Structure formats: structure tokens, C-alpha cells
Amino acid sequence: MILHVVLFRPRAGLEEGQRQDLAKAFASAIDNISAIKRARIGRRRTHGRAYEQLMRVDYTYAAILEFEDLAGLRAYLEHPAHTELGARFFDCFEQALMYDFDVYDGHVGLNTLLEEEL
């Protein structure tokens, strides 16, 4: 499985209409791109732990999309609904990180820590 992880902070002064357009573009991607197996989008939660203070950037939101394989991720990235989402997204964020990860369930995933490349 591949996770497409996006951490982002909207730019200051983002208008309500722009937020709504971004949410609609996310919804359209989720509804129209069958390669997305699961989508989770939410706001950062803090609860007073020391590690929260160590973060250099406060990313307010996360979007985590799951794909069965690389072909699914590529289908998502090349889909017109993603193109529209990207246009809205890049117009709205102040800072963002985007990563793709191969992930495995349970102990199988731990084996990746044993690989040479850390």
C-alpha cells in the first residue's frame, strides 16, 4: 500500500470562498478518482506533549490518501480532478510537505527499519 501524505498550513487571510473551493476540490477528487482507497483529512491536535514544541513548522492540516499500488498513485496524480485540486491547493497554502510512503501492516512494516538505507 502507498500513502500519499500532505501536511499543510493555509495562508493567513484565506477567504471563506477559497476554503470552500478547496474543500469542494478535495471532495471531487475523493468522489471521482477510484484509485483512492481511503482518504483521511483533518486538523492537527495538540495535547501538551514536549514533542509538539520541537516542530519547526506548525502544519494545521493533514490529508492522508491510501492507494493499493504505484499505478493507483499515478492514476490519482494524472487525473483531472487532481489537477483541479492542485490548482486550488497551491493557491491556498502557506507551507506544505508532500510525501509518498510504501507501508505495510504490523511487524512486516518493521522489517523496513532493518534495511541498509535508514
Where are these regions (language model features)?
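C-terminal structural segments of small proteins and small subunits
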Residues: 70-103
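Short S/T/G/P-rich N-terminal loop/turn motif that feeds into the first structured element of a domain
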Residues: 1-61, 68-75, 102-118
